[in-house]
Amino acid sequence: MFFRPDFRPRCAKWLIATGLFLMLGACVEKPTTLERVKEDGVLRVITRNSPATYFQDRNGETGFEYELVKRFADDLGVELKIETADNLDDLFDQMNKPGGPVLGAAGLIETSKRKQQARFSHSYLEVTPQVVYRNGQSRPTDPGDLVGKRIVVLKGSAHAEQLAALKAQTPAIEYEESDAVEVVDLLRMVDEGQIDLTLVDSNELAMNQVYFPNVRVAFDLGEAREQRWAVAPGEDNSLLNEINAYLDKVEKNGTLQRLKDRYYGHVDVLGYVGAYTFAQHLQERLPKYEKHFQTSAKKEQVDWRLLAAIGYQESMWQPAVTSKTGVRGLMMLTQNTAQAMGVTNRLDARQSIQGGAKYFAYVKDQLDDKIQEPDRTWLALASYNIGGGHLEDARKLAENEGLNPNKWLDVKKMLPRLAQKKWYSKTRYGYARGGEPVHFVANIRRYYDILTWVTQPQLEGSQVADGNLHVPGVDKTQPPAPTAPVVPASSPEKPAL
């Protein structure tokens, strides 16, 4: 074999150059977690599908955790991608998978077990674990009273860890963990007497108790605890440091407190306020807006009294109302809906009524052509309240149960299931406060019945404002008991509630 005289020197130089190149390459630092997020332009977050964390309503994506983490993504200048976990164990499993979500935002409590699964941020919300029971049953007053009770909590939750610690001290305490339910399901089970007790955090109870009148707090189990976000343990500190800086900032500038007030502060509920109050508002408020209701309803081919009933349910005919969630005006329109309907000033009563009428007509027109009146009107009201996607989920549930998806009486039985994990986990649009549209439609029908009665031909126009107007069952000098309001019976063409 023949070799060129200069081969070995050249080979040596090549090897040296290659080695230096590899060494330099090894010295190049990998991008940090924060840098990767910014380069990808996406922040992947995993959460729970529940009222206190993340869900969709007629306004779109919402929830305390969602709004807080959405602001964080906006601060980073990236898109937010929300993923929902099947349960708490699944949440941590997904975070720890290669290429999984980089952030967990689901009202998480830092526990000894979870410290092995994730690293936690600064706190942003203080909550108290509470034992809840059904009103009318014997009230537990301390952990010893948990013996002999059927207790169910979320699988993998901090509450399950608390009960495990109690059981170590008092072996007679028994409890079950379930990954097939959410907090709302547990409260419903207590409310209906299916289980004796459960543990929930104070914020989630405050948000949901209005829907479960039989649920009561027995006692606080331990001291207040702090909710935090979580990042995978294998990541560097860059994202966690950025999160902590963000949480500190929103704490100082008041953003965090405003979110707390919106979701956990006192919420005014516009339910059935009583026939007496309604009669007073018929005289004092409706005459100012009656022509606007009639004009807009005629244009959109809607009964003006139905439109007025919607307006009363939404704002009690108050044009300057603004809710904590940002809906405004007599018809309580969202900013997006107002823009879509051509409303430039939501606080202008005429524009608000026009926008509400146009939007209701649009929603009604989107329904399946097979749906006939009067069910078409009631289902349109439900869609107006909860959103078309969730209504379709309820209709599909009705169909699967052998019920008629085109009948309000059947669909309204399915709507509350959208708040139960057993059912919403099978739907396209997920969790929704399904009980709300049922009450929304029921209230509007009550108001509509009264409006129909008082606006018979002999009571048209300005006579509605007559001081001698009488609503059946109402003594104008003595308001009726709010627990038993009397309203006219539904007319024959309207199906009974």
From Swiss-Prot:
One of its GO terms (cellular component) is cell outer membrane. The gene is mltF. It catalyses: Exolytic cleavage of the (1->4)-beta-glycosidic linkage between N-acetylmuramic acid (MurNAc) and N-acetylglucosamine (GlcNAc) residues in peptidoglycan, from either the reducing or the non-reducing ends of the peptidoglycan chains, with concomitant formation of a 1,6-anhydrobond in the MurNAc residue. Keywords: Cell outer membrane, Cell wall biogenesis/degradation, Lyase, Membrane, Signal. It is a peripheral membrane protein. It is an enzyme of class 4 (lyase). Residues 464-497 are annotated as: Disordered. CDD domains: MLTF-like (cd13403), PBP2_YfhD_N (cd01009). This is Membrane-bound lytic murein transglycosylase F. The active site is at 314. In the N-terminal section; belongs to the bacterial solute-binding protein 3 family. One of its GO terms (biological process) is peptidoglycan catabolic process. SUPFAM superfamilies: Lysozyme-like, Periplasmic binding protein-like II.
